[in-house]
Amino acid sequence: MNWLNKPLSHIYVEHGATDYATTKRILERFPRSEIIFIDDYKDFFNRRNQNFEAQKLSPKLILAKKKSDYIYDGSQFVQEGDETDYFYTALMLNCLYDCSYCYLQGMFSSANLVLFANLDDYFTSVINFLSERDDSHKQILLSISHDCDLLAFEK
């Protein structure tokens, strides 16, 4: 007998993320999930002394608003030659799956998922970033799925 809640049985929503279309669409998709409103996703995600294995049996979803740092410098070891710079964004944190070969396992001490609902802010940030680059002649590689498996969460 399984005493745990089903995966995504609870959805935590930051107060600042409630009005985004992404949040509304996801909440409509999970009408049976219990909705819990929170102030900051960091109060529930990646805290100390969490049991990753227990959480992985019943992960929760956290809908948040990304407040800053939309684009990060990527590793210098991922470069595609001297003419390409590597950057990444974090649209989502963590993964639904538990693949033993994946670097995401162990990247966070939490098995819960964070999805940032303010996608338009990401797009604006990328546009501003591109227009402000000093070395605009160099190509960039921008990963949108560095800290998660975005395709796994598509549907």
Task: Give the ranges of each region predicted by the language model.
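Conserved aromatic-histidine-acidic binding/catalytic patches
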Residues: 10-14, 87-91, 111-114
